[in-house]
Amino acid sequence: MKLLALFPFLAIVIQLSCWELGTDALPSGGFVRTKGVQFSLNGYPYYANGFNAYWLMYVASDPSQRSKISTAFQDASRHGLTVARTWAFSDGGYRALQYSPGSYNEDMFQGLDFALAEARRHGIKIILSFANNYESFGGRKQYVDWARSRGRPVSSEDDFFTDSLVKDFYKNHIKAVLNRFNTFTKVHYKDDPTIMAWELMNEPRCPSDPSGRAIQAWITEMAAHVKSLDRNHLLEAGLEGFYGQSSPQSKTLNPPGQFGTDFIANNRIPGIDFVTVHSYPDEWFPDSSEQSQMDFLNKWLDAHIQDAQNVLHKPIILAEFGKSMKKPGYTPAQRDIVFNTVYSKIYGSAKRGGAAAGGLFWQLLVNGIDNFQDGYGIILSQSSSTVNVISQQSRKLTLIRKIFARMINVEKWKRARGQGQVGKRGHKINN
């Protein structure tokens, strides 16, 4: 029996089943792969119900604060979260990882080492981003400034994507991260299955080139560079999901602005293994009503999940979403609606074997790091209705994975049994 034929049956079973199937926990070791429109881990479908915590390296660089990292992963694991996304960059400025091109701060690198070690201990996979689009933690601007100080004729942050020296700086940073030897786990990053994927950049944009050609060429070049150094890990571009010239009919879905990216064309590039989308209706449409923002969210998610499934044929993660407590009129119920909407779209696709493979809320915090609270932060240890929504999604996706695992194991057993009962001439062998 083919697994595709069982997807409708699976949906019914999930609705009728209790949460705990009694199946032994599936192993979390090994490298995450893609298989069609799904992620796969150790031969079974894998789902990324997780969170963003960009501050992990920064906080862990101070040994006296590392207990906060342990608490974060412990809390996440208790709530069934499986993936965390964080920064592998801090370029120039205060507490830099990279002081100047090729010059690194060992304390910061050891902070990232520790975060990866704790993630590994708690069975959580990590997505590491190589650079930032924005000025915080250096970003494109810092790379361009470094090139300008060496005499390059660069005048705009957008030169990050085209200047040869800037690109060399960036490629060298990628190489430094991939070849980093973790001082805690004694494993090079490029060989560490705790890392689920690399991300080229957090939210790349090139507004000076609305055609999208600059970023298309840059992603093509950098994806090839990463894959030349590391064939173990998945790679994604860090895109927010804005449509471009390759799908003009979908550009009406975009929020206002010029971004220089193309969701379809950028994600078709060889070496880009899965698709990402971000969504912040309260930021992108601040003057719109709550209902209008939710209408946008539903259309935005539907379009991207469908395109990942039917056009790109790759898994998709909603890599950033949330609801700010700092917006006028905010209520916890509004945030719950946003989370439930996102999770329902993911679950509806996943239970049918579709492309939606998970969501990472922005952002996870713990007690004692109030300076990182941007309005979106969620502390799992503080009981709230949103935390219950998060935990429920973890249980749902875990159940799907267990059911798929049972189906796969039954198919393996049937094939093995059939082979064992047939002799060399095709005669059935009696027991």
Curated annotation (Swiss-Prot):
Induction: By gibberellin in germinating seeds. The active site is at 203 (proton donor), 320 (nucleophile). SUPFAM superfamilies: (Trans)glycosidases. Pfam families: Cellulase. The keyword Endoplasmic reticulum does not apply. Its EC number is 3.2.1.78. One of its GO terms (biological process) is plant-type cell wall loosening. InterPro entries: Glyco_hydro_5 (IPR001547), Glycoside_hydrolase_SF (IPR017853), MAN-like (IPR045053). Substrate binds at residues 87, 202, 280, 362. It catalyses: Random hydrolysis of (1->4)-beta-D-mannosidic linkages in mannans, galactomannans and glucomannans. The keyword Secreted applies. Keywords: Glycosidase, Hydrolase, Secreted, Signal. Expressed in stems, flowers, siliques and seeds. Expressed in root vasculature, leaf hydathodes, anther filaments, stigma, sepal vasculature, at the base and apical parts of siliques, and replum. Expressed in the micropylar endosperm and radicle tip in early germinating seeds. One of its GO terms (cellular component) is cell periphery. It is found in: Secreted. PANTHER family: MANNAN ENDO-1,4-BETA-MANNOSIDASE 7 (PTHR31451:SF64), PTHR31451. Required for both, loosening of the micropylar endosperm, and rupture of the seed coat in germinating seeds. May participate in the hydrolysis of the mannans in the cell wall of germinating seeds. This is Mannan endo-1,4-beta-mannosidase 7. It comes from Arabidopsis thaliana (Mouse-ear cress). The gene is MAN7.
